[in-house]
Amino acid sequence: MDFKNKKWLFLAPLAGYTDLPFRSVVKKFGVDVTTSEMVSSHSLVYAFDKTYKMLEKSPLEDHFMAQISGSKEGVVKEAVEKINALEHVNGIDFNCGCPAPKVANHGNGSGLLKDLNHLVKLLKTIRENTNKKITSVKVRLGFEKKIPKEIAHALNDAPVDYVVVHGRTRSDKYQKDKIDYESIALMKGILKKPVIANGEIDSVKKAFEVLQITQADGLMIGRAALRAPWIFWQIRNNTTKLPAVVKKDLVLEHFDKMVEFYGDRGVIMFRKNLHAYAKGEMQASAFRNCVNTLTEIKSMREGIEEFFNQEMLQSEVPLWVELNQKSV
C-alpha cells in the first residue's frame, strides 16, 4: 500500500453491517480498503466452519482485511494460522478499539489499551505467524482516560503497516462531543507509520477538515456509509453532488445480494439496513414498522420498490445511524 501518492479511504468494520453484500455495494463507490466484521480469535480457532463465511469476499474487493480480536497469545497465533489458508484475504487488522462491555471487559478490543506491552506483543505474534503482506491495528485514544502519546510510542515498536485511530476513548463510546481530532494529530506526529483517522466523518466538508487537522494518511468511515455508501465517491471527487445512481436500484441490489448470500434469512437480516437507508426520508417511521413484519422475499422487494420510488435522496448530507453495542 502506497500512502505517498493519495489519501486512502477505508470502510470501517461494523458488527452486523459490513458483511460481504454491503461491502460489495460500497466498493462500487470508490472505497479503497474494506474490512470484515470483527471476528474473535476464539471463534476462528474453535468454530471455524461457522466463522469462515464472515471472511468471504467479493471479486470487487482488491484490498480486503480480516479484522480479528483476542487477548490470548496462543489463540491469536492459531487464528492467524487459520487465516493463512484463506488466499483471498490480503491482510489482518487487529481490533484494539471495540468498546462493547462483553469484549472490552474480558481484555479484548479496547481492553488491551490498559496493557500496551501486551498489545504490542500480540501484534508481534500476528506479524511473526501470518503469511499476509499487510498487518494493521485499530485503536482508540485510551480506555478511561486519553493516553495518545503512550499509545503512539508503544505502536512504534509494533510491526504494523498502518494504524487506525478512532478519536475517542472507550469510556466516550460514541458521544459526538467527545471526538478529539487533535489527539489523532498528536499521534500522527509521533508514529513512524501511516495513520488513518476515524470518527464522526459524515460529509465531504468534514472529511477534508479532519485531514487538515490530523494530517492523516487516510480516512476510515463507518456509520455515514450505512445510509450513503456514495460518501467515498463524494470525498474522492471533492463534491457534495450525488453520483448517477438511483437509490431504489442500489437498495434492491443490496437486498438481492443479501438473499443470495444468506438465503431466506437474509430478508430479516436486511431490516436493519433498510432502517439506515430510510433514515431522513418521508414516512421513514411507518416504513420501518412495515418492514419489521415482512419475512418473504417477494413482499420485501415490493416494499422496497414502493418506498424508494424516487431517483435521489432528499438531503445531500448523510444522517447518523445508531448502532448496537456490538458495533465497532
Residue ranges and their predicted role:
Residues 1-328:
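Flavin-dependent oxidoreductase catalytic cores
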